[in-house]
Amino acid sequence: EEAADALTEALDKVLESSVLDSVNKNELKRFMSGTAMYTAFDFTGDEKYRNAAIELAKGFKDFERNDNGYFKDADDKKCLCKAYQYETFYMAYETKDGGKEQYNDVIGQYNAMNDELFATVKYSQDRTKALKKLSVYAASLIDTMEVMDQMIYEIFRKMQDYYKASVKAVLESGVAAEGMDDMDDEAELIFAYAVLKGCRMKALHTEKYEGIVLGVCDKVMSGEIFTGEDTEANDTIISMAALVYSETVRNREYQDYGRGKGGALWS
C-alpha cells in the first residue's frame, strides 16, 4: 500500500506539472512513464492514469523510424538498451487498450534491433558497456513478455529466445565466475532483476540461474549495494535495488496470468 501511494503521488505530480508535454516528442524516454500509469490504474482504478497512458501511447503512431524500421531516438543513436524506454509500454498498451493490433510491430522492432545490434554488443571489446547494454535489454524483454497476451505464443517464444540469449551472453563473458566485478552497480542490479524475474516466469530454469544472482540479492538486503565508493546512492541505484528486492520477496511459483487476460499488470 505504501508503494502504491508513493507511485500515485509521483505520477500525480507528473500529470499536474504537464511535464510529459514538455518532453521532446522525438525522444523515446517520454514513453517510460506509461507502464507506471497502467500500474497506478491497476492499484487505484482511477481512470485518469489509464487515460494518461492512452494519450501517451498516441505518440507511437507517427514516431519516426530509422532505416531498419524500429523507432529512431532524437539523438539518432542506436542501442539495445533503448528498447527498455518504450517496448514494454508499447506492448502493455496494445494488450490493454490497443486491441493487440500492433503486436507484430512490437516484435518486429525487437527483431530488427536484435538483428542489427545484438552480435556487435555481444562481441564488443568494451566489456563494461556491453554487459550493461545486454542486462538492460534482457530486462526489457522479460518485462515485455510479462505484459503481453501469452496466447500469442509465437511472439512470446521469440522474445524468450532473445531474452535467454542476452542472459547467456552476459554469463559467457565470465561475470558469474568473477563475481560480476566487470559490472557497475546499475548493470549488476538490472541483470539480477532480469534473471530473478525470468526464473519466476519460468523463462529460465530456477535451479540453474537463480543462484548466480543471489549474491546481488544479499548485497541489496544488507544495504551493501548502497555503500560503495559513493557516499550516497543515486536515485537510479535505489530504484533498481527496489526492483531486485521486489523479485526476492515475490512468489517464486510463476502464476499463469490468465491466458486471454493479458499481462500481469491487469490480471
Language-model segments: which ranges?
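Membrane-interface helix-loop-helix junctions at boundaries between adjacent transmembrane segments
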Residues: 71-76, 97
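CBM-like carbohydrate-recognition segments
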Residues: 1-34, 40-55, 63-68, 77-78, ...
